[in-house]
Amino acid sequence: MYALTGHITIKKGICILFCCICLGTTAYGQVEQFQEHAQTLCEDATFSSALVGIKAVTGEGEVMVSVNEAKMLAPASNMKLISTGTALFSLGPEYRFCTTLAHDGYISDGVLHGNLYIVGGGDPLLGSKDTVATALNEVFEQWEKDVRRAGIRSIEGAVVGDGRWLEGRGVEPTWQWGDLGTYYGAGVSGLMFYENMMSFTVSPGPEVGAPVKMEPYYPGCSWMDFRFCGVTGEKGTGDQLYMYASEFEPVAEIRGTFGLDRGTKRVDCSNMFPEYTCAVYFKNHLERKGIRCINGAGDFKLKKDWMKEGTADSVKVIGSHYSPVLERIAFKTNHESNNLLAETLFRALGKENTGSSCIDSSYVALKGVLKKMHVGSSGLSLQDGSGLSRQNLVSADFMCRFLGAMMDSSCFEEYLWSLPVPGGNGTLQYNMKGVPDDVRTRFRIKSGSMNGVRCYSGYILPAGFTLERGAEIPQEIKDRTIIFSVMTNNCVSSTWKVRQILDRFMVELGK
């Protein structure tokens, strides 16, 4: 009996050993195949001038592909994976930004003898048209109720936009000058408004060389000195208009060309004075509702006449407004690749962890969070939170380490949901066209692109697993998930060709 049992055990052991050898051989063969795919990609003529870094690992840590994984490359918007991830990890998915309404001075017979302050707390979606944000008229109506509840029927001072939540400049010094006037180059401020944009309607002139017709649309910034220098370009030249402005003077010049065959369209540019814009719009709202503001609107940067009447050192809070939760902000950040939101999360890390939202403090805070995540900062040299700076440098190895640490965190489900699916809504809508849904929908990735740069990093979920909102992801699924990063720099080939080749590589990796 015992001999027979031992004989069966030996047979079982031999079978198990044989299976393990087969599985090991298969796994090795797959890794070898993936490595060949990666080498083929690097040797493609499309990337003849490019630097390429690739790494892919399983959730258990097994390396599947590794090519130049330690080379540090410009990540472009792949930086948003880091800013949204560290914010979710450090601040929590339920974190909200708070804007408060306050006044100084005193109230007598319905008159506020002082100033009314809109004290910004870094809410990047105040006044945004996005459906995730509270509609501006609702915010203003609530603030109006707060003003009336405080017994204020008239304001002898000014309505002041207070953006001092932000220390230092709102833009990163290494951003390119040509980006600063664009909607995607809008800098952070303590009090933001309409995502720090201003919109114009643009239409071509009657002939090539004629002035472009351009008018402010929203918000109406009447205090700005706009210099419209754009001209009508040849057919097929598209929109090549750029706005050049700075936060030091309310002057903006729009230069470039707008194609003769283009129809009337809306163009979004950056607003360097969102604090004052918000104050003006709320002041106008109050006056429409019968609450006079004797000294108009002001801020701490553009219009400071009001400071003769008050110092804002001691104020009484009479109302507040909260942003959407961070989880939803992260979703919008990664799906739209929204630079302003990413920069805000980066600065919030500094504010909450060091007490300062300046760039240097935010960098120190982010490195501290990475240390808590046991990721470290080797393979990372950052300048901002959005990836707009070309001086950001990240290795594929660091990106995989970071994504692996996020998988082990308590906020992984929220983080994963924030990442777009190829072919779906967001910045990946043109990726993986024609790829079957059961393959395509397993990907949760973030793209990064600028001139000469194309990067993709994220997760490939196991086949047969359906991701459900709010459901915990089993460890077995995490172990079988592929974590990857593909980064290309200095590539002069066409965008569509690069995207097509990288799509094929990612699909092969997913198989």
Label the model's feature ranges.
Residues 61, 80-87, 159, 191, ...:
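Residue-level preference for non-acidic, small/hydrophobic
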Residues 54-56, 99-101, 457:
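Short beta-strand scaffold segments in enzyme catalytic cores
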Residues 40-41, 90-377, 464-469, 478, ...:
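Conserved serine DD-peptidase/penicillin-binding transpeptidase domain
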